[in-house]
Amino acid sequence: MNRNEILFDRAKAIIPGGVNSPVRAFGSVGGVPRFIKKAEGAYVWDENGTRYTDYVGSWGPAIVGHAHPEVVETVCEAALGGLSFGAPTEGEIVIAEEIAKIMPSVERLRLVSSGTEATMTAIRLARGFTGRDKIIKFEGCYHGHSDSLLVKAGSGLLTFGNPSSAGVPADFTKHTLVLEYNNIAQLEEAFAQSGNEIACVIVEPFVGNMNLVRPTEAFVKALRGLTEKYGAVLIYDEVMTGFRVALGGAQSLHGITPDLTTMGKVIGGGMPLAAFGGRKDIMECISPLGGVYQAGTLSGNPIAVAAGLKTLEIIQREGFYENLTARTEQLVQGFRTAADAAGIEFTADSVGGMFGLYFAAHAPRNYADMARSNIEGFKQFFHGMLDRNVAFGPSAYEAGFVSAAHTPELIDETVAVAVEVFKAMAE
């Protein structure tokens, strides 16, 4: 047995499923997960000492590359001053001001430690602000693992959702309406039927949890128009897309001003940090100013804030997003060409430093489209690349990520590996 196998067996004896987040167990692709020992730049090394070119990027945060020397130095310096205080710090103010400068929709902001905390609190805040209970989410969009959002679509188009996890009471989800992404007719009907009861709509403005799915321009406009018409809060869940698809997030590309925004991943620079923010009148409903309660022992942790501030500084340097976007487009175009040459039905898409790979003729517009793609084809591709030391997320439903550490030469090397894999798949 190699070290990965030994550690996985050992982990399963003490950690449920052997992992601390389900997708890491390789359940949807089969095989043994790689236990990572270290990471640097565009690479990760497993416990066997094998180096992989990494397109997981810690599921998005590693936008400047793993263990960026400036970020590491900043974290080490901050740690010398203490690891956690449970009290306000100047750094909290500075990072909130910086985010508000980059993302003008954020008039007030609060820091938390995880994306789940951010979305959970944003939902609570929207309900407290509007005095309404019902919420709309979209099938295939993931907003963390709070009870109200662990919901799958009901049996009919406009039935309220069913729990998608054991342990979630039906009473928690009866207020959650699950609609099809990019389906304007369903959205209009939902508001026509229940508009005055809907507290908020929460949406991934580019979906990253049913692979990368783009919204149509008309869908985005309908989201903003209907929420404004009925007095519902529009929540952009930019935990994944914020500072990843563009400096100002997806909202800057859409030209949309959401009422609330949740963010995470990139803003922590690899450390546990997330936030929610938006309109002043809504945000001031949060305790201690208002009656909506939220708290956290490690919220605004000084080490995470330091890492986040340095990362935000780096990504604002000249040419950062132009180069990131070019490298990501180079990757997906190379993959499309390689698959076409091998006669494999495949396409790919990207926005900023985020990309999607689809074993289908066309990129999906919603969850049903994605579910019809060739999942077995993805599994073959995933293992073919992994066996050749290139790592992607172990699920056909996860987007991938390019970092500033991925050079044009490294992208070319990855495409050359994909040429081999697609040829092998075609044989």
From Swiss-Prot:
Pfam families reported for this sequence: Aminotran_3
Look up the record and name the cofactor or cofactors this protein needs: pyridoxal 5'-phosphate
Q: What pathway or pathways are given for this protein in its record?
A: Porphyrin-containing compound metabolism; protoporphyrin-IX biosynthesis; 5-aminolevulinate from L-glutamyl-tRNA(Glu): step 2/2
Report the EC number(s), separated by commas if there are several.
5.4.3.8
Query: Where does this chain mainly localize?
Result: cytoplasm
Query: Which domain of life, per UniProt?
Result: Bacteria
Q: Which Gene3D superfamilies match?
A: Aspartate Aminotransferase, domain 1 (3.90.1150.10), Type I PLP-dependent aspartate aminotransferase-like (Major domain) (3.40.640.10)
Q: Which family does it belong to?
A: Belongs to the class-III pyridoxal-phosphate-dependent aminotransferase family. HemL subfamily.
Q: What is this protein called?
A: Glutamate-1-semialdehyde 2,1-aminomutase
- Annotated gene: hemL
